[in-house]
């Protein structure tokens, strides 16, 4: 039998994972890594990671008065670091795997483009991407949408939606397993879209494969990722173009 995506992820160095998120300040995709500045997360988002989680933790980070300075450790825990878990002498929840449980999110497969559109430029788009690396996408209750290679099962991309950030600290809570909550619980789907300006008859088609994901039971929100070229674009340096948008209830 082949290895599971969880076992492959557990054998991966957390620092090598490509994980991106949405920066509320600049309103763009950014690497999900701690920084002393607001380069990757806004100050409000960073404050969410300094919350001590318990049964009273709310999604409004500002209303939580029990805080500490373990934000960087919590973010690294979410990335997969295990050195602060209880079994290692730390205070964070023990995990059986870095990959969280998947409950209601259905797997979505994306290989070569297969739609038979007769629109301008689409046939070239299909030819250009006929050898595209096949990826399966699925949401998890570790706070991420995952993209796994169907070739070897390795994680190629993970996305943390803005709507999950206020509650991510709960994943470090030792009592989380008895107080489970959903995060990225919705099912992703994709479609091929011409994103060019078609107001001119001389426009140049710009076809992309766009993924739409939702939080499902994890909240009211959706996000859009450009998953056209996994091998070229699934890097943290391209987070700004990879994440097209991320909207939650009452967000701007």
Task: Describe the residue ranges of each PLM region.
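A fold-level detector for beta-propeller and closely related beta-sheet-rich head/sensor domains
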Residues: 1-252
């Amino acid at each position: 039998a082949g290895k599971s995506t969880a076992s492959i992820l557990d054998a991966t160095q957390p620092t090598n994972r490509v994980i991106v998120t949405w920066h509320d300040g600049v309103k763009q995709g950014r690497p999900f890594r701690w920084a002393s500045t607001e380069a990757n997360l806004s100050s409000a988002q960073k404050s969410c990671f300094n919350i001590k989680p318990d049964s009273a933790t709310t999604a409004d980070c500002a209303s939580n008065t029990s805080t500490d300075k373990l934000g960087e450790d919590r973010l690294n825990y979410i990335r997969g670091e295990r050195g602060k878990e209880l079994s290692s002498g730390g205070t964070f929840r023990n995990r059986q795997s870095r990959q969280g449980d998947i409950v209601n999110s259905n797997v979505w497969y994306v290989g070569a483009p297969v739609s038979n559109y007769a629109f301008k430029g689409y046939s070239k788009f299909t030819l250009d991407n006929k050898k595209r690396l096949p990826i399966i996408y699925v949401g998890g209750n570790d706070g991420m949408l995952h993209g796994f290679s169907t070739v070897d099962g390795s994680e190629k991309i993970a996305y943390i939606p803005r709507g999950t950030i206020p509650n991510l600290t709960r994943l470090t809570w030792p009592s989380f397993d008895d107080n489970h909550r959903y995060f990225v619980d919705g099912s992703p789907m994709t479609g091929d879209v011409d994103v060019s300006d078609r107001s001119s008859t001389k426009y140049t088609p710009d076809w992309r494969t766009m993924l739409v994901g939702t939080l499902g039971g994890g909240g009211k929100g959706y996000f859009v990722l450009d998953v056209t070229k996994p091998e070229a674009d699934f890097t943290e340096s391209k987070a700004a173009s990879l994440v097209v948008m991320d909207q939650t209830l009452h967000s701007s």
